[in-house]
Amino acid sequence: MNTSQLREKFKEVFGVEADHTFFSPGRINLIGEHTDYNGGNVLPVAITLGTYGAARKRDDKVLRFFSANFEEKGIIEVPLENLRFEKEHNWTNYPKGVLHFLQEAGHTIDSGMDIYIYGNIPNGSGLSSSSSLELLIGVIVEKLYDIKLERLDLVKIGKQTENDFIGVNSGIMDQFAIGMGADQCAIYLDTNTLKYDLVPLDLKDNVVVIMNTNKRRELADSKYNERRAECETAVSELQEKLDIQTLGELDFLTFDAYSYLIKDENRIKRARHVVLENQRTLQARKALETGDLEGFGRLMNASHVSLEYDYEVTGLELDTLAHTAWEQEGVLGARMTGAGFGGCAIALVNKDKVEDFKKAVGQRYEEVVGYAPSFYIAEVTGGSRVLD
């Protein structure tokens, strides 16, 4: 969607002209899954599937939200003085949370807004539509109210919204990738220290194909919080002998030597995934820096195997996509991405083989699962921004 279309749609809905238009990307994580809330390393990219917005300041204290993705909900009106979580306010709880925490941080938002939203991230796909929306709202408020914010502070407010307003115990990776994204670069982020590097992403004759299971996954209702609790318990058991706060601080030799302290087989598996995935992510960064895409692909495969057998967050749909992808010509690697339990997988595929790949994987998936997957090519882009 371009800026003139955005402005046109805004005027159709609200009857006035928008002040500005905005874009906030989605994200995929190339490798480093379920490590971000364990103090580990991640390697995400911001992508051109994302959330568009048009907005205008109002003279009163009323917030009016409209989403083209939830047209049936119409315009949702919220008084600026009432920024509490309310289930019936549906998707607007995300903007409300961001506004609430911006105010709590001392920023003056002294009037209402009209905000039009259009997203082309498939709902429930695990490509971070909620984080994309959170950062979009942050950028809108920055622009309309002339607030000067460090981008990292906005990223943290997005995470705070997810954790303390919506109630999902997620890490910081999604908001970080979306807020800090850069053209044709992956972000190597240490989630423990928030130190990061931009890693140039030269895929040569290959593209990242996103494979959507089309199985809806509600993060708050999934086993996400359960996995996090298992990891936290494993850390507390290891603390009997080790001075650590997170699993991300461990190398595999140390973990192996002290894993006997963990009193449950499942918790050992969960912790082992995190420790090894952390090492794979470091190796993947090196592979990208040296142009070793075959090595990078093998690490993607190993990541999926670990998520399937040790972390147990894949399921029939994601496994069918990844396993079938591995068998196709021109594929360097494939793995689930995001929280799992549905959502998406990604594959690194030779450009000339993409159509054959989609046909073969799509056919097999439909045979096994009973309905078709969707495919998208991921273009890497910069972070949340003002368009005009």
Curated annotation (Swiss-Prot):
Mg(2+) binds at residues 130, 162. Substrate binds at residues 33-36, 224. Its main location: cytoplasm. One of its GO terms (cellular component) is cytosol. ATP binds at residues 67, 124-130. Its EC number is 2.7.1.6. It catalyses: alpha-D-galactose + ATP = alpha-D-galactose 1-phosphate + ADP + H(+). Pfam families: GalKase_gal_bdg, GHMP_kinases_C, GHMP_kinases_N. The active site is at 174 (proton acceptor). It is an enzyme of class 2 (transferase). Belongs to the GHMP kinase family. GalK subfamily. HAMAP family: Galactokinase. This is Galactokinase. It comes from Streptococcus thermophilus.
